[in-house]
């Protein structure tokens, strides 16, 4: 306790010397720290239910080779990924997305998966919210099999495509390092793709005490030296079993577990975690806490072939849950609210179209429903650059549904008796629309195609 008190005292004095200044990044809050939760769909849902709150940010993953986990369920033993489902479940939360290279960073850099990159960017860009894209997350983690040159080339390509496709306002690029204690110091520069293409520096925070916080401090200093905001993209009290109140010093197999009190666990891991934020308050602008029962997910479970992780769910121990809630009640932590997106520097993209569309379409249509609006599968004009595709519900089981424009598909939302989804489009252009829906009482699924010319019709 004396050592911790000394560390807090010195760090607090040092923090007072920091001067507020503008950081070079995108979707960076002027004040405060974004609080997000991960990292699989069901763990996020469990946290939200147990804590009685909507997370300000939610985290999930996708593989670039097959886009597994983007719009369909994917579980590689670390919990279920489905970014579209998660985004629809939390429509007013920021989205933090980790993209795996699936061990093929060279082919990614060579352009083999450029079409998948574009699909990913368009899907994320269509969500009306701040998106933090952790491209090739934990870039220097040896388990990922990355090489420096291909990694940097792919990072620069994605940054450029975000701008070319028109989504620079809501997709921010995060360069995340592993902060892994066994890695040698002084290597970050070899992985750096350039100040001009990095919006945030990210790090992982699991067991930094194993190397006296050297690796996380190195990452923080790298962000500071490049004037970039810092995001703790992955954090969890590794080797602690919160439900069982135990800790193991064995990172490989979790042997010789020691009994801990709830107060000990809080003081040993959580207090230094939040103190790290104090120490770096000049640059630290976001964190993601992985709130999961790692031991119940087969990738992390016994015999612990990928190391021993434990159980990090804060809700399972009343004392830890209370301390967590008390800590996050500090106004410096950005929680979910109606002002969340504005706090993150993201504007309301709906502001300019509503009145104009109403006037233009009312005049053109003469106040009457256009003749071609009688079709159940149709579209509405939103703006000269946005089309809403919809299909009237015909009583399908509809456990899933997708609306597509030129074979670019997104999960639809059901409202007022119809499934709908908006897409970027150009007025006057011809498009192929497709609707796919589960139909367990019929043929298993229905697939309906239609070719249309995008006009300023408004059908509903």
UniProtKB/Swiss-Prot annotation:
Q: Does the keyword Disulfide bond apply?
A: yes
Q: What does the entry say induces or represses the expression of this protein?
A: By beta-1,3-xylan.
- Give the Gene Ontology MF terms in alphabetical order: mannan endo-1,4-beta-mannosidase activity; polysaccharide binding; xylan 1,3-beta-xylosidase activity; xylan endo-1,3-beta-xylosidase activity
Tell me what the record says about temperature and activity. Optimum temperature is 37 degrees Celsius. Stable below 30 degrees Celsius.
- Signal peptide span per the entry? 1-22
Any S-S bridges, and between which cysteines? 373-459, 404-409
Show the segment(s) annotated as Carbohydrate binding module (CBM).
368-460
**Which keywords does UniProt give here?**
Carbohydrate metabolism, Cellulose degradation, Disulfide bond, Glycosidase, Hydrolase, Polysaccharide degradation, Signal, Xylan degradation
Q: What does this protein do?
A: Catalyzes the hydrolysis of beta-1,3-xylan into oligosaccharides, mainly xylotriose and xylobiose with smaller amounts of xylotetraose, xylose, xylopentaose and xylohexaose. Weakly active toward beta-1,3-xylotriose, yielding xylose and xylobiose. Converts beta-1,3-xylotetraose into xylotriose, xylobiose and xylose. Converts beta-1,3-xylopentaose into xylotetraose, xylotriose, xylobiose and xylose. Does not hydrolyze xylobiose, p-nitrophenyl-beta-xyloside, beta-1,4-xylan, curdlan or carboxymethylcellulose.
Q: What is the name of the protein in this document?
A: Beta-1,3-xylanase TXYA
